[in-house]
Amino acid sequence: MQYNPLGKTDLRVSRLCLGCMTFGEPDRGNHAWTLPEESSRPIIKRALEGGINFFDTANSYSDGSSEEIVGRALRDFARREDVVVATKVFHRVGDLPEGLSRAQILRSIDDSLRRLGMDYVDILQIHRWDYNTPIEETLEALNDVVKAGKARYIGASSMHASQFAQALELQKQHGWAQFVSMQDHYNLIYREEEREMLPLCYQEGVAVIPARGD
């Protein structure tokens, strides 16, 4: 397995990242096709044996059960310092409403850490752009999460390049923690990100985490 620095961070991640949306209890959340824990654990173990150290999940995957399954498997099969764990915030989980308000972010990170059984995540990503919350409120809350030691870094996902550029500029102006990664829909067939997002990320030193787009 080959490893690379993740953008400007001190994280070294495997070239392959294991996306964990498929892991989750089928009777929780919106996807009945997910793999329950007994089927998920061998895949996570095999990924670790193959050298994958980068795991990406989200608070909303299978109503939080993806985080629970991934957290338990990593505790059993790996040392915390040997893996890079990323999760996301935005979508509804249980009675937590959708969005990126300060209250939602602060509650969500605590809930994610509890489900993962971890003291911190390596990357907390915003899953979407929140059109109903001022971006300044979102960015300041993310900065406070980093200052509290609950996330080492923050990342973004699924937004327009103009929105991402606005957020990066506001972070610079206020001295807030900067986005270090962009997880976007990008593959050999869908290459729209080559127009604006990838050049922006290259210019800003932001790592790109290609995903199928969920």
Predicted regions: what they are:
Residues M1-V83, K147:
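N-terminal binding-site loop/beta-alpha segment at the start of enzyme catalytic domains
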Residues L6, L18, S40, A47, ...:
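Conserved, mostly hydrophobic/aromatic
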Residues M21-F23, A58-S60, K88-R92, I126-W129, ...:
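Active-site beta-loop-alpha junctions enriched in small/polar residues
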Residues G24-E38, R92-L106, H127-N132:
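Active-site mouth loops of central-metabolism enzymes
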Residues A73-V84, L113-G117, V146, L168-A177:
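Acidic (Asp/Glu)-rich catalytic clusters
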Residues D95-Q125, H185, I189-R191:
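Active-site gating/metal-coordination segments in enzymes
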Residues T133-D214:
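Beta/alpha (TIM)-barrel catalytic core signal, keyed to glycine-rich beta->alpha loops juxtaposed to Asp/Glu
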